[in-house]
Amino acid sequence: MRGETRRHGREVKAVGMLSGGLDSILAARVMLEQDIHVTPVHVRTGLTYARRNRLAGREPSAPPAPQQAAQALGLELVTIDAFEAYIPVILDPQHGYGSAMNPCVDCRIFLLRQARQWMEEHDHDFIFTGEVLAQRPNSQMRPSLAVVERESGLEGRLLRP
């Protein structure tokens, strides 16, 4: 869906971090209702159940959740393959590990940097996510959200509706 909202005489374009979960779908819907051009982006780290199942020789029973979500929204998903670049993040996270030994804050910074690069290369204005304040004990608390915004290089260009 193309938006009609204009900024300085041109269409406003947003990159939507689409995980396939309800929060990112709702965030995309809010942007679309504001007549903002939305490009859904999914950064593939390779560390998913789908990858595990493929490596085990099991065929996927359905398209990945981000693909299903984009289709439901009537949008074409952009997938960024970042597996190799992601390995150092999980081996030595600057901000430590989350409760399940996952590098929550570092992961968010990494994903948003990948999306920021795509955003800049494709002349989009900002990025939005489906993050919810205090929904996760490490990465979605106000101080962590501020660190992620700053260290991803998206100060003033990251919206969490």
Regions found by a protein language model. Give the residues of each.
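ATP-dependent adenylation/nucleotidyltransferase module used to activate substrates
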Residues: M1-P161
